[in-house]
Amino acid sequence: MLLWPGASGLPPPRIFPSLLVVVALVGLLPVLRSYGLQISPTASTIRGSEPPRERSIGDVTTAPPELAPESRPVNHSFAEHSPKARKAFPVLGIDYQHVRIPFEIALWILLACLMKIGFHVIPTISSIVPESCLLIVVGLLVGGLIKGVGETPPILQSEVFFLFLLPPIILDAGYFLPLRQFTENLGTILIFAVVGTLWNAFFLGGLMYAVCLVGGEQINNIGLLENLLFGSIISAVDPVAVLAVFEEIHINELLHILVFGESLLNDAVTVVLYHLFEEFANYDRVGIVDIILGFLSFFVVSLGGVFVGVVYGVIAAFTSRFTSHIRVIEPLFVFLYSYMAYLSAELFHLSGIMALIASGVVMRPYVEANISHKSHTTIKYFLKMWSSVSETLIFIFLGVSTVAGSHHWNWTFVISTLLFCLIARVLGVLGLTWFINKFRIVKLTPKDQFIIAYGGLRGAIAFSLGYLLDKKHFPMCDLFLTAIITVIFFTVFVQGMTIRPLVDLLAVKKKQETKRSINEEIHTQFLDHLLTGIEDICGHYGHHHWKDKLNRFNKKYVKKCLIAGERSKEPQLIAFYHKMEMKQAIELVESGGMGKIPSAVSTVSMQNIHPKSLPAERILPALSKDKEEEIRKILRNNLQKTRQRLRSYNRHTLVADPYEEAWNQMLLRRQKARQLEQKISNYLTVPAHKLDSPTMSRARIGSDPLAYEPKADLPVITIDPASPQSPESVDLVNEELKGKVLGLSRDPGRLAEEEEDDKDPDGGLTMRTKEPSSPGTDDVFTPAPSDSPSSQRIQRCLSDPGPHPEPGEGEPFIPKGQ
């Protein structure tokens, strides 16, 4: 087995992409020589039957024996034993015509896959040039090579494009459509898709008609309806080109869904305008009734396509109820019903793209609830593979068809088309955004408007519609096709290659590479429920209200019909958590892992016993991506989504806790004691009060109703906060302790009475003013002699500010016990 050095970390050789191209082109040699293989002239044919196949051995070609005419008698026994009638047994033969069609299809798909591998091997090229541009270049080279050997290159037929290549891309986009971003911005998307496409078609068609009038003899015979038809073809944004470019630059979700949603939903407008102007071009006179019918056909085409898609989506979801015993065919129903929806819409000239999107969006939640996880993985990767191959073939065939098609070049018409396309796109985006921002909460910034206008790429849909034009009714279809190809190449090459550096230059927000956590998903749903309740209270019925209505209807009626078994009841999160724990415990018992778990059920004890265990040695292995995705899916489906009237509680219905008050008082005393010890240890006390000023009456917490109401028998103290002498806080030092420290003489009996009176019934600390002992005399403290050592020490302590105060030391003390 050959080993490639790139697998061990070494860069791949530069010649590797060239070798892939050479291998693909060598494989095309049978296709190039297919027209040169002819039947041997010696081979005879039987009338009304298939001609006999020629056989070859080495370089010698032999033909089947010539049959005798019917009128001539033949001796069968002689013919059987005659040595001239027998030929050597053919060991090897060549019959390319027998396998030509499937061989060429497989060869083109192989070429597309090899090209994708070759482009991504060299990161410098893939980081500068988009993949779509490189595929078109490969198509041009292959087309030129086929034409250089004298053969006719294949052309991208419109039937092949619309019936086989386009549906996988649209189904992949519709089935995995980010529904939340799409529904939240649906109004903006519809305005850009409908009004913007109409503006581009009529603006471009009118200006091109004016150019044709003054452009010269070659184009002055193109009428107004022909120019309007051309404008409707070239005005639509192509979803294939948008996907190919925007997936590589990783633009943020808002801009991506606006541009991509516009490219999906403008299909109805494009189909209606295309058929309308194509029919009007054959009329001698167009009346008002025809215009009204054409206007009504827009609603029929768009809404009819949505209806067809919804019907097939419901049928697919209902069918998936009965596939629990046959899991193998589950992915097949998704592909078949979606494709049938597209074909049914095209059968009635409805919008097939709208039908595919509607069917994918409708069937996905119910189908995924019924099918297994392996079937979901199969659907996901098969759709991604199918759409990627189709996209690659489209761009390659676009380059090949450019070489093979017939063109008619006119500088005036082509340059005017390119210039007016850019002007119409810019003016349309600016005008519509100015109107949309009046109603949006999150406004579209000028940077967003520039990216939306710059991301209007054209692609293979416009080419296929232009190729469908009949030369008998539209003699200038070659000129139209040349102008369409020019616009496609300009938007894909110039705009597609420069949009990445422009996004980096403008610092446009990009898409988050990491997936949202389960915590974020839970809080997102919580905010949705909260906004729904706010809308109900305000009486404003926004999209949250209608979304909740649809969810309730879906849970009550639709899920019971389309989802099988108990999965339609959507159990509560706690019940599901118990089921998950039970399942995990059963797995541990079966695997024999319970022997490693200690007998204690506490998680903390497990952490203490195995504090340094490596992640690989843990009992429970890490979750895989599939397991994590399954948990996300189950949580997303089982979270509470309904707005039920729960039991409301207030302070009158709550049961009182008998230990709550005692616990709060204990916390209050503990905090007061801690505050007292902190002040004494740091010598941080307020300056001594003047002897002629009474102290505060009480010190209580803020919740006490008597905190700021002095008693009647106590003097009222008025404190001016602006005065520098007003204390900022009340010292909570015990009066007895303070008196002992200062050496003050107090009457012991009097002091005991005051202590008895100062006791607060609720356990708080109370401070009272000193009442006079006799009328006319102020009972004040008698200080000790100033020359005593204790007095000198306390004066130094009071005058010295001490160490730096801690944070919050000078602020009033408010307990936090409550």
Swiss-Prot record:
Activated at acidic pHs. Inhibited by amiloride and 5-amino-substituted derivatives. Inhibited by cariporide and eniporide. Phosphatidylinositol 4,5-bisphosphate (PI(4,5)P2) and phosphatidylinositol 3,4,5-trisphosphate (PI(3,4,5)P3) bind and differentially regulate SLC9A1 activity. Keywords: Antiport, Calmodulin-binding, Cell membrane, Glycoprotein, Ion transport, Lipoprotein, Membrane, Palmitate, Phosphoprotein, Sodium, Sodium transport, Transmembrane, Transmembrane helix, Transport, Ubl conjugation. Residues 503-545, 633-818 are annotated as: Interaction with TESC. Residues 515-545 are annotated as: Interaction with CHP2. Residues 122-130, 177-186, 250-252, 323-328, 372-373, 439-444, 506-818 are cytoplasmic. Residues 1-98, 149-158, 216-222, 284-287, 342-350, 405-410, 470-475 are extracellular. The keyword Ion transport applies. GO terms for biological process: cardiac muscle cell differentiation; cellular response to acidic pH; cellular response to epinephrine stimulus; intracellular sodium ion homeostasis; positive regulation of calcineurin-NFAT signaling cascade; positive regulation of cardiac muscle hypertrophy; positive regulation of the force of heart contraction; positive regulation of transcription by RNA polymerase II. Residues 44-76, 741-818 are annotated as: Disordered. It comes from the Eukaryota. The modification Phosphothreonine is found at residues 603, 782. It is found in: Cell membrane; Basolateral cell membrane. Belongs to the monovalent cation:proton antiporter 1 (CPA1) transporter (TC 2.A.36) family. Homodimer; dimerization is crucial for its function. Oligomer. Interacts with CALM in a calcium-dependent manner. Interacts with TESC. Interacts (via the juxtamembrane region of the cytoplasmic C-terminal domain) with CHP1; the interaction occurs at the plasma membrane in a calcium-dependent manner. Interacts with CHP2; the interaction occurs in a calcium-dependent manner. Interacts with EZR; regulates the cytoskeletal interactions of SLC9A1 and promotes stress fiber formation. Predicted models used for more than 20 years predicted 10-12 transmembrane segments. More recently, the structure of SLC9A1 has been solved and reveals that SLC9A1 possesses 13 transmembrane regions. Electroneutral Na(+) /H(+) antiporter that extrudes Na(+) in exchange for external protons driven by the inward sodium ion chemical gradient, protecting cells from acidification that occurs from metabolism. Exchanges intracellular H(+) ions for extracellular Na(+) in 1:1 stoichiometry. Plays a key role in maintening intracellular pH neutral and cell volume, and thus is important for cell growth, proliferation, migration and survival. In addition, can transport lithium Li(+) and also functions as a Na(+)/Li(+) antiporter. This is Sodium/hydrogen exchanger 1. It comes from Bos taurus.
